[in-house]
């Protein structure tokens, strides 16, 4: 992903303030509520019968935290996202058979969650930078599919 120094500073600076546990659970929960067909990958998580059940499901929260932790780790490798996400790409492609479009959807949900929590601090410039990053991460995660 090519970011200007200003964009990189916005992304890294804002991510340092992210509550990975809370926001990660919220993002994965929102993905499952907004795009219900994604639930088929998480049927073993128990009750996904309603928005409330999903948003309060401890397994959804825990996996969301894991997703955000991986995303944060990826931010340390913006110049080589494909390398940073190679193992996860392989796992999601070969073992889990996740539709790579879901990575793009989750990236957009991640941006929504950041906007919700950071309000005015999540400026149009910050959003533009994050959109570049989530597109790059989605592309890296889909790499094994090509």
From Swiss-Prot:
Tissues of expression: Red blood cells.
Modification sites for N6-acetyllysine: 59, 82, 144
Top-level taxon in the UniProt lineage: Eukaryota
Oligomeric form and interacting partners: Heterotetramer of two alpha chains and two beta chains.
Protein name: Hemoglobin subunit beta
InterPro entries registered for this protein in UniProt: Globin, Globin-like_sf, Globin/Proto, Hemoglobin_b, Hemoglobin_oxygen_transport
Role noted for this protein: Involved in oxygen transport from the lung to the various peripheral tissues.
Origin species: Trichechus inunguis
Keyword Repressor tagged: no
């Amino acid at each position: 992903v090519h970011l200007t120094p200003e964009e990189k500073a916005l992304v890294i600076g804002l991510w340092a303030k992210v509550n990975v546990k809370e926001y990660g659970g919220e993002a994965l929960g929102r993905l499952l509520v907004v795009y219900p067909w994604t639930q088929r990958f998480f049927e073993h998580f128990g009750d996904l019968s309603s928005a409330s059940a999903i948003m309060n499901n401890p397994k959804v929260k825990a996996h969301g935290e894991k997703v955000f932790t991986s995303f944060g780790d990826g931010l340390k490798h913006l110049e080589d996202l494909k390398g940073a996400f190679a193992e996860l790409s392989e796992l999601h492609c070969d073992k889990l058979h996740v539709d790579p479009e879901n990575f793009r959807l989750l990236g957009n949900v991640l941006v929504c969650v950041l906007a919700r929590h950071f309000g005015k601090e999540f400026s149009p410039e910050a959003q533009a930078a994050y959109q570049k990053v989530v597109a790059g991460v989605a592309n890296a995660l889909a790499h094994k599919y090509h």
